[in-house]
């Protein structure tokens, strides 16, 4: 693990070249480094000052805006410096060379600035994960989910629950220790378990949205399945707006699973084109069919495609009806099928029915995640810890015949599980994984 006593630096802005590049320095020697680079006293805290950045020969490297953030009022909680320079590779290389030459400074590892912010109490683990998701957000709903998490709204909810568990335990301890005292009202036990029953209901309702956050964050998975030449690859290309899949009249052209991401009104949708499902003696095609079925089974929604002039096989119609839509393709051709057999009719090649399909996809997404609801668990680990919390609270409520001390212990375990979501309880084994999601300089 990197030494948190080191002073670190990195490029914190985007790829070079750029109009402006931002170098961040954090640690005990950050201000010493800035004085060495500028040859002048520090500017006023949190005030942008124009300075000449110089090399060891006192030659000007660049004219830069410099901002200093004294500890603890900085992103990392340490002394921090930001240097806003022109974003050429030559300027950055020269400044980094001077920082290397100063001694006592080193380049930051991926996510190290954010890790220091966490270790210094500037962010909790939920906020760190939210920041990582915000940096990678590609759609409006991903941005909203990440902002609610990174701004502490989800942490506030979980901390509130933890405080209610702590208060319940305190009341139980009071009843255990001072049962004979008049200061402890007889109704304390009733209050505690009524409050815990209410908390159980809130956690349970929150968990109902447990998959919603993962769908928003990781994408709504849509599998295109059907017989060979049903129009799956043509539809994939039409929805993505580019030639992703090879389209021919030869049955079995698609052998492997292809995927493309699209932004559907703020939602990330992952569309999977699969091999045509049919009986075949071809070993490679048979493996493609196996993968097609597996992809469909793990998708959030299955689009079962059938062209106008074919009769669907039983194997195509055996998927979960609750997770599937039947789509008639190639609608400009003559048809043996009734429109009543399908949820949608399209011609991907001609662009017919695609807007209706997009609207149907959005309706399916919002049926799963709710319209605009983003205060939900965003990761599988959040859901796992919440389920643990719910189980412990349930155990405490259901153990009426057990000693109060045992029931109080269940509540302590529930609070511990909540604490592992925010990082209030030891989560050292998680930190390396989480901070590896960050780029250098964040």
From Swiss-Prot:
The cross-references to InterPro entries, in alphabetical order and at most eight, read:
G_TrmE, GTP-bd, GTP-bd_TrmE_N, GTPase_MnmE, MnmE_dom2, MnmE_helical, P-loop_NTPase, Small_GTP-bd
Sorted keywords for this record are: Cytoplasm, GTP-binding, Hydrolase, Magnesium, Metal-binding, Nucleotide-binding, Potassium, tRNA processing
Task: Outline the extent of the TrmE-type G domain.
Answer: 219-366
**According to its record, what are the GO cellular component terms?**
cytoplasm
**How is this protein named in the record?**
tRNA modification GTPase MnmE
A GO molecular function assigned to this protein is: GTP binding
List the subcellular locations.
Cytoplasm
Locate the coiled-coil region(s) and give their ranges. Answer: none
> Which residues does K(+) bind?
229, 248, 250, 253
So where does GTP get bound? 229-234, 248-254, 273-276
Q: Which domain of life is it from?
A: Bacteria
Quick check: keyword Hydrolase in the entry? yes
UniProt record, GO biological process: tRNA methylation; tRNA wobble uridine modification
Q: How does this protein assemble?
A: Homodimer. Heterotetramer of two MnmE and two MnmG subunits.
Its primary localisation, in coarse terms, equals: cytoplasm
């Amino acid at each position: 693990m990197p030494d948190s006593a080191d002073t670190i630096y990195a490029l914190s802005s985007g790829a070079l070249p750029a109009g402006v590049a931002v170098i961040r320095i954090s640690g005990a020697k950050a201000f010493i480094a800035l004085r060495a680079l500028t040859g002048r006293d520090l500017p006023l805290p949190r005030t942008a000052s124009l300075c000449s950045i110089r090399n060891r020969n006192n030659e000007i490297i660049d004219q830069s805006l410099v901002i200093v953030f004294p500890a603890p009022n900085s992103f990392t909680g340490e002394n921090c410096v930001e240097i806003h320079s022109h974003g050429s590779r030559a300027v950055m290389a020269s400044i980094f060379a001077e920082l290397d030459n100063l001694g006592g400074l080193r380049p930051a590892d991926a996510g190290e600035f954010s890790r220091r912010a966490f270790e210094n109490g500037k962010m909790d683990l939920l906020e760190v994960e939210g920041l990582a998701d915000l940096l990678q957000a590609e759609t409006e709903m991903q941005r909203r989910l990440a902002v609610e998490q990174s701004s502490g709204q989800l942490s506030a909810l979980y901390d509130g629950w933890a405080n209610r568990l702590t208060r319940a335990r305190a009341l139980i301890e009071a009843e255990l220790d001072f049962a004979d005292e008049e200061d402890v009202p007889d109704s304390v036990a009733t209050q505690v378990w009524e409050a815990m029953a209410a908390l159980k209901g809130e956690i349970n309702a929150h968990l109902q949205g447990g998959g919603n956050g993962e769908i928003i964050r990781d994408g709504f998975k849509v599998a295109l399945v059907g017989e060979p030449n049903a129009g799956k690859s043509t539809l994939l290309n039409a929805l993505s707006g580019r030639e992703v899949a090879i389209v021919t009249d030869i049955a079995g052209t698609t052998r492997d699973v292809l995927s493309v991401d699209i932004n559907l009104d703020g939602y990330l949708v992952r569309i999977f084109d699969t091999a045509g499902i049919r009986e075949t003696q071809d070993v490679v095609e048979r493996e493609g069919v196996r993968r097609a079925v597996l992809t469909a089974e793990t998708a959030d929604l299955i689009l079962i495609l059938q062209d106008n002039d074919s009769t669907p096989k039983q194997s195509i119609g055996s998927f979960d009806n609750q997770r599937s839509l039947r789509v008639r393709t190639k609608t400009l051709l003559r048809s043996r099928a009734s429109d009543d057999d399908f949820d949608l009719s399209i011609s991907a090649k001609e662009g017919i029915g695609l807007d209706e399909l997009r609207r149907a996809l959005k309706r399916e997404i919002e049926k799963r995640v709710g319209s605009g609801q983003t205060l939900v668990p965003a990761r599988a680990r959040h859901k796992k810890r919440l389920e643990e919390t719910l189980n412990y609270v349930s155990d405490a409520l259901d153990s009426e015949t057990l000693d109060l001390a045992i029931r109080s212990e269940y509540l302590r375990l529930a609070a511990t599980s909540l604490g592992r979501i925010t990082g209030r309880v030891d989560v050292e084994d998680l930190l390396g994984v989480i901070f590896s999601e960050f780029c250098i300089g964040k």
